[in-house]
Amino acid sequence: MKRLIAIAAVAAVLGTGSLAYAGSLGRPCTDAGQDKWLAVEALRGKLLALGYTVRKGKLKNACGEFYAIDKAGNHVELFVDPTNGNIVGTL
């Protein structure tokens, strides 16, 4: 029983650590002002041209944040520089 509790405690600690960064790159994708950013639809178009199927997207914390499916069928979260559409991170 003690072993089960210890395993559950370790799993809980490890699980919450990864949640802190889930849905966030942890840093801005650009330091350019919002007047230099592309619209969400323009960023979406760039991702479509790269072969992603985009499900949802938004601008958040100086990043374009997109939920998509890649060419291999994997669900990915993409972080995009809003000034040029370059992918700067994935989860």
Description of each model-found segment:
Residues 71-73:
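Glycine-centered tight beta-turn/hairpin loop motif at sheet-sheet or coil-to-beta transitions
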Residues 20-30:
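Cleaved targeting-peptide boundary
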Residues 76-89:
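A short, surface-exposed beta-strand/turn
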Residues 30-54:
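Short, non-transmembrane alpha-helical segments in secretory-pathway proteins
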Residues 1-21:
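Classic N-terminal secretory signal peptides
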Residues 47, 60, 66-69, 79-80:
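Conserved histidines in hydrophobic membrane contexts and catalytic metal-binding motifs
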Residues 54-60:
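Surface-exposed patches in mature extracellular/periplasmic domains of secreted proteins
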